[in-house]
């Protein structure tokens, strides 16, 4: 999506995402996966590099996604010294809710009709294997659940 920008040289089309990023706004939307996590971290690093003291707004509208990718975003937010403001626009479910909750108290904003939802970690599609491998997956899910619960306390 593009927007028009007027200048002395006429009208140019500017990608909307670039314009929002120049206003220090990062959108976290759609399924949380490895690609989205790395894109988020690249954008965060660019904005921190430009001005480490100017606040960054993170706008979330996501049904969640992969645990590992969500934890990567969580870790990036926790390690960031730049002031962050997190906004829930519409929904923050599952890992997106954890990411929203990772913001500092007083710096998290929930729009009036937005929703948060947290649930126990779920198995991914196509899980198969012998009893030992299924037990290992189950133990991994329980560990993830405990880690998430500890973060949310």
Where do the language-model regions lie?
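Terminal-region recognition feature
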Residues: 1-153
């Amino acid at each position: 999506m593009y927007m028009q920008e007027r200048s002395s040289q006429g009208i140019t089309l500017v990608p909307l995402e670039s314009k929002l990023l120049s206003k220090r706004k990062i959108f976290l939307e759609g399924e949380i996966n490895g690609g989205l996590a790395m894109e988020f971290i690249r954008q965060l690093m660019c904005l921190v590099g430009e001005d480490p003291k100017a606040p960054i707004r993170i706008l979330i509208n996501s049904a969640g996604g992969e645990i590992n990718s969500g934890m990567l975003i969580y870790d990036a937010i926790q390690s960031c010294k730049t002031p962050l403001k997190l906004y829930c626009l519409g929904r923050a479910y599952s890992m997106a809710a954890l990411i929203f909750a990772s913001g500092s108290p007083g710096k998290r904003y929930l729009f009036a009709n937005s929703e948060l939802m947290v649930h126990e970690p779920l198995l991914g599609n196509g899980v198969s294997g012998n009893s030992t491998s299924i037990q290992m997956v189950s133990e991994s899910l329980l560990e993830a659940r405990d880690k998430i619960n500890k973060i949310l306390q």
